[in-house]
């Protein structure tokens, strides 16, 4: 029921990117992704629905070929299997929610 920051699963991703798995259930998962300015989340796709909230900073998101800039307080929806990637324009943090949970994020 409660997710504690001290218990987060921390994983370095691409250069300048760190993922923290904060909380999950059988059906969903929440992660915090920290980015240094200029860092990229490489293009990928997955069968999960994803909603991303910009907690800090500014980012350029591309989803299925459409690119938009999003800033603190904005959000982004990625449907299942959408090809997407991100570039950090101003150092910041994203909060990702996945449905269903990302089993691959729980493996060490």
Q: What is the meaning of each model-derived region?
A:
Residues 66-80:
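Short acidic-glycine-tyrosine-enriched beta hairpin
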Residues 55-56, 71-72, 90:
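A cytosolic small-molecule/anion-sensing beta-strand core signal
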Residues 80-104:
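Ligand-binding loop in jelly-roll beta-barrel domains
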Residues 31, 61-63, 95-96, 103-107:
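Anionic, Ser/Thr-rich low-complexity intrinsically disordered regions
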Residues 31-45:
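Conserved short histidine dyad/triad with adjacent acidic residue
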Residues 48-49, 53-59, 64:
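Glycine- and acidic-residue-biased ligand/ion/polar-headgroup-sensing regions
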Residues 1-27, 107:
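A short, N-terminal "cap"/entry segment at the start of jelly-roll beta-barrel domains
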Residues 40-41, 60, 76, 80-85:
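Histidine-centered metal-chelating micro-motifs
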């Amino acid at each position: 029921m409660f997710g504690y920051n001290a218990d987060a699963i921390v994983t370095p991703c691409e250069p300048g990117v760190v993922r923290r798995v904060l909380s999950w259930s059988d059906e969903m998962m929440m992660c915090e992704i920290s980015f240094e300015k200029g860092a990229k989340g490489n293009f990928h796709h997955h069968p999960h629905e994803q909603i991303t909230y910009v907690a800090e900073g500014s980012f350029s998101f591309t989803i299925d070929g459409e690119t938009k800039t999003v800033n603190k307080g904005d959000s982004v929806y990625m449907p299942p299997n959408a090809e997407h990637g991100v570039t950090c324009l101003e150092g910041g943090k994203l909060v990702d929610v996945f449905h269903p949970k990302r089993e691959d994020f729980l493996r060490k």
